[in-house]
């Protein structure tokens, strides 16, 4: 579902398929299954039409919630108010246009011009889902990336926030994070990652990861900051 979601947001960025109402804070996207399939195939992430159908079903029917300070601030589906040609033909044709409303927080970001631009090609080239999750986190959190700044995060936070560390053994979960960070090194995002284990006795209770960015990622973050500033002024 996550890759299909990214493809849809990329399609939305093409104004030909985007409808945004700033007064109502609503954003709608027009798409076909064929458009999604082509967008994924172009980035080496080919999916069958049936897989795309299932992903859209999940994004439309599953409810997610956002919390701030342990208080729910938003609840809804990733694809809301899905409009199709009829239940019999529901997502049956690769050439049939469908329309869906994007979540409120996306519309709010567009209205306030506080969304982050990033390297979409690099995101889609990452093989591991956790790698893509960490990459998007760095894009949004490591906004002041420079040659002298570092970004730190905790294992416990990654596990809770990502929902992608479901192994029974914590050692396997930790290995999965290291694999994701290594892929980010290969993709030219992070230069180094220092590991500081927190222990009680011999037991590891948490891990602190301290990251330095590559010159390329620093350059991209600076450019993204400038574009955001230019748009707002």
Per-region residue spans from a language model:
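Charged, alpha-helix-forming regions
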Residues: 1-233
């Amino acid at each position: 579902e996550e890759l299909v979601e990214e493809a849809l947001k990329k399609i939305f960025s093409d104004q030909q398929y985007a409808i945004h109402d700033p007064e109502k804070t609503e954003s709608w996207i027009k798409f076909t299954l064929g458009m999604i399939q082509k967008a994924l195939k172009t980035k080496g992430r080919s999916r069958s039409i049936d897989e795309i159908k299932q992903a859209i079903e999940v994004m439309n029917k599953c409810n997610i919630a956002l919390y701030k300070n342990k208080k729910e601030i938003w609840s809804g589906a990733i694809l809301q108010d899905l409009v199709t040609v009829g239940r019999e033909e529901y997502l049956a044709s690769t050439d049939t246009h469908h329309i869906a409303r994007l979540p409120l927080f996306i519309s709010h970001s567009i209205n306030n011009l506080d969304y982050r631009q990033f390297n979409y090609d690099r995101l889609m080239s990452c093989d591991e889902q956790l790698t893509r999750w960490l990459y998007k986190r760095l894009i949004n959190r490591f906004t002041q990336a420079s040659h002298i700044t570092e970004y730190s995060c905790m294992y416990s936070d990654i596990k809770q926030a990502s929902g992608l560390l479901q192994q029974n053994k914590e050692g396997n979960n930790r290995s999965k994070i290291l694999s994701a960070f290594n892929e980010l090194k290969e993709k030219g995002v992070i230069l180094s990652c220092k590991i500081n284990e927190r222990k009680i006795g011999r037991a590891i209770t948490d891990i602190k990861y301290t990251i330095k960015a590559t010159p390329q990622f620093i350059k991209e973050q600076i450019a993204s900051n400038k574009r955001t500033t230019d748009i707002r002024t």
